[in-house]
Curated annotation (Swiss-Prot):
Keywords: Cell inner membrane, Cell membrane, Cell shape, Cell wall biogenesis/degradation, Glycosyltransferase, Membrane, Peptidoglycan synthesis, Transferase, Transmembrane, Transmembrane helix. It catalyses: [GlcNAc-(1->4)-Mur2Ac(oyl-L-Ala-gamma-D-Glu-L-Lys-D-Ala-D-Ala)](n)-di-trans,octa-cis-undecaprenyl diphosphate + beta-D-GlcNAc-(1->4)-Mur2Ac(oyl-L-Ala-gamma-D-Glu-L-Lys-D-Ala-D-Ala)-di-trans,octa-cis-undecaprenyl diphosphate = [GlcNAc-(1->4)-Mur2Ac(oyl-L-Ala-gamma-D-Glu-L-Lys-D-Ala-D-Ala)](n+1)-di-trans,octa-cis-undecaprenyl diphosphate + di-trans,octa-cis-undecaprenyl diphosphate + H(+). One of its GO terms (cellular component) is plasma membrane. This is Biosynthetic peptidoglycan transglycosylase. GO terms for biological process: cell wall organization; peptidoglycan biosynthetic process; regulation of cell shape. Disulfide bonds: none annotated. Pathway: Cell wall biogenesis; peptidoglycan biosynthesis. It comes from Ectopseudomonas mendocina (strain ymp). Its EC number is 2.4.99.28. GO terms for molecular function: pentosyltransferase activity; peptidoglycan glycosyltransferase activity. Coiled coil: none annotated.
Length: 242
């Protein structure tokens, strides 16, 4: 009886893992129609007098400005081109900081944030963290770095009901994402720790200071030349359509 139940559970786990892997593989080419975070925000608003209206419009990689790509990397994950989904040094530093009694500090890479935003609910439980690690590994396995950043920039929250670079650019600055300048891009990146608390379009002193620091980091990282490190490097025999 117990052995049969164990076998069934293992079989179920296998099929769930296979289904999740196929889903992540498909999203290498297909734009995600929505995210788990968008659904969560929509559900949160059901009890309010005015339900939340979600705004999001997909922009492909070549229509997203280099300023914004670099601003987000500088602000959120400066080792993005180097790691395989997890920044061990940042994790160790965050653990030491949290154990010292300071305010909770995260150490999520862009890859982890994509996994969390696309597939998972909010929270810090161990089951959710385990699923985040699983989806992060799949994303790093199946997607090139450019695709990870493309999905991130089209899915990240930038205000109440505002998701993705295009909606954020229009909402905060009245322009399309391709027309964001360097300062505007840095202000968008500056509010990412808490985009529902801070405004990129109406920055306070903290956001302005952080945006200035982000612009310095963009320069130190090499500017748009850094993005060359994100290009996939395949052997000559690799099919170009993959």
């Amino acid at each position: 009886m117990l052995r049969s139940l164990t076998r069934r559970l293992l079989k179920l786990l296998f099929w769930l893992m296979l289904a999740s892997a196929l889903l992540v593989l498909a999203l290498r080419w297909l734009p995600p129609p929505g995210t788990a975070l968008m659904l969560e925000r929509k559900i949160e608003s059901w009890g309010s007098e005015q339900p939340l209206q979600l705004k999001r419009q997909w922009r492909p990689w070549n229509e997203l400005p280099d300023h914004l790509k670099m601003a987000v990397i500088a602000a959120e994950d400066q080792k993005f081109a180097e790691h395989w989904g997890f920044d061990v040094g940042a994790i160790q530093a965050a653990l030491a900081h949290n154990q010292s009694g300071g305010s909770l500090r995260g150490a999520s890479t862009l890859s982890q944030q994509v996994a969390k935003n696309l597939f998972l609910w909010s929270g810090r439980s161990w089951p959710r963290k385990a699923l985040e690690a699983w989806f992060t590994a799949l994303i790093e396995l199946f997607w090139p770095k450019e695709r990870i950043l493309e999905v991130y920039l089209n899915s990240v929250e930038w205000g109440d009901g505002i998701f993705g670079a295009e909606a954020a650019a229009q909402h905060h600055f009245g322009v399309g994402a391709p027309y964001l300048n360097r300062q505007q891009a840095s202000q968008l990146a500056a509010v990412l720790p808490n985009p529902r608390r801070w405004s990129a379009g109406r920055p306070d002193a903290y956001v302005n200071r952080r945006a200035a620091w982000i612009r310095q980091q963009m320069t130190q990282l090499g500017g748009s030349h850094y993005l060359n490190q994100l290009k996939p490097r395949y052997p000559e025999w690799w099919p170009r359509w993959l």
